[in-house]
C-alpha cells in the first residue's frame, strides 16, 4: 500500500512563524485560559485577514515545517507540459507522470495569484498512476473564486487582470509556473 493522504493544514517550524505567537491581552500562558479560573475575557484582533494558513506563510515568505497539501509516497511523480488558458476563465493543462517503481496516487494542486495578491488554491485532482504511466490533467478555476466584491455596486465582479499560475503537489512546492489573463 502506498500512502496518498495530504495535509489539510500547514505546520509551523516554531510558534514564531504564526501570525500571533502570543494572544494580545493574555497576560498568562495559554493553558490558563480557563474562564472558571478567573481569566478575564479579552478581544483578539485578527489583523492577518484572509491571509491564513498557507497564504500566511507565502505573505511572510516563511517556510513551514510541513505545508498545506504535503504528503508522503513510496514513489515519485514528475510534472510537465504546462499550458495556461485565460480569457473569460482560467485553466491549466499539464501532465503528471509516475516516475517511480510503485503505483501511487498524486494530488496536483492549482494555485493562482492576481497582481499584488497572495496565491490561492483554486483546484486540485486526485490521480492514480501505475509506474511509468502519464496522465494529462486540466484544472479550471471557478470564476466565482476569482471574483472581487464591488462595494459601490453591491455585487461581485470578474477579477480581470493578469494571474500567476502555480501547479504542484503542495502549497510550498511549485512544480510548474505560468501566467495568463482574465478579460
Where are the predicted features?
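Terminal connector regions
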Residues: 142-183
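Secreted, periplasmic, or luminal enzymes acting at the cell surface/secretory milieu
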Residues: 1-91, 96-105, 111, 160, ...
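Composition- and surface-driven signal marking solvent-exposed, interaction-prone regions
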Residues: 106-111, 119-125, 151-158, 178-179
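Solvent-exposed residues in well-ordered beta-strands and their adjoining turns
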Residues: 97-99, 113, 140-144
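Intrinsically disordered, low-complexity Pro/Gly/Ser/Thr-rich segments with frequent PxxP/GP/PP motifs
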Residues: 117-151
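Intrinsic-disorder/low-complexity, polar/charged segments enriched in Ser/Thr/Lys/Arg/Asp/Glu/Gln
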Residues: 89-93, 134-138, 175-177
